[in-house]
Design a protein with these regions (language model features):
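Glycine-rich and polybasic anion-binding loops at the starts of cofactor/ligand-binding domains
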Residues: 1-180
Length: 180
């Protein structure tokens, strides 16, 4: 994917009305830094054995509303007894088929950002950190209440239908209160 394609997709993301404009400076700063350094190459010490050419050759699109399933997805092939599951399908949280244990609160990424007044912690250690911050488009937050014992594992299941090359950049937050 060329830098121009990333720039076009980034502008589409900024034009979305359902994201808080207060996040735009964080996004823009991260994207600007990504533009300056680009993808790692094999000349970078930590990436010398990693071939990233497939990332550059494909044209990825950000997930749009049209990418959300029109009906509840069948996840029966992914069922595991004794697990609570949170489902993200093509980048869209599926509340109807997601569950968490008692004492655990589940928020969407937007709800969590509002709760935290859009104060995001983010890393700038690699181009992928920057790209994820610039393109963060969804996500979930689990808040484990004070003195809560969670006896059931929670899994976050990401499903892509594979119909197109969708770029999904979720933010996952797990807040564990004291004594939990």
């Amino acid at each position: 994917m060329s830098l121009t394609n990333f720039q076009n997709e980034f502008q589409k993301l900024l034009d979305r009305k359902y994201f808080s404009p207060e996040l735009h400076p964080v996004r823009k700063d991260a994207f600007s830094k990504f533009e300056a350094i680009g993808f790692p190459t094999q000349k970078w010490e930590n990436w010398r054995f990693t071939n990233l050419s497939a990332l550059k050759e494909n044209h990825y699109l950000i997930s749009e509303v049209k990418d959300a399933p029109q009906k509840t997805p069948d996840i029966s092939n992914y069922k595991i007894e004794g697990l609570q599951t949170i489902v993200i399908y093509n980048g869209h949280f599926q509340q109807d088929i997601s569950s968490v244990p008692e004492g655990v609160q589940l928020l969407t990424g937007s709800e969590y950002n509002e709760l935290k007044n859009n104060q995001l912690n983010h890393s700038e250690k690699s181009p992928f950190d920057l790209l994820n911050t610039a393109f963060m488009d969804s996500g979930v937050c689990l808040i484990v209440g004070k003195n809560t014992i969670v006896g059931t594992p929670v899994r976050i299941l990401f499903i892509s239908d594979g119909d197109s090359s969708i770029m999904v950049n979720p933010r996952l937050h797990i807040d564990i209160e004291s004594g939990s």
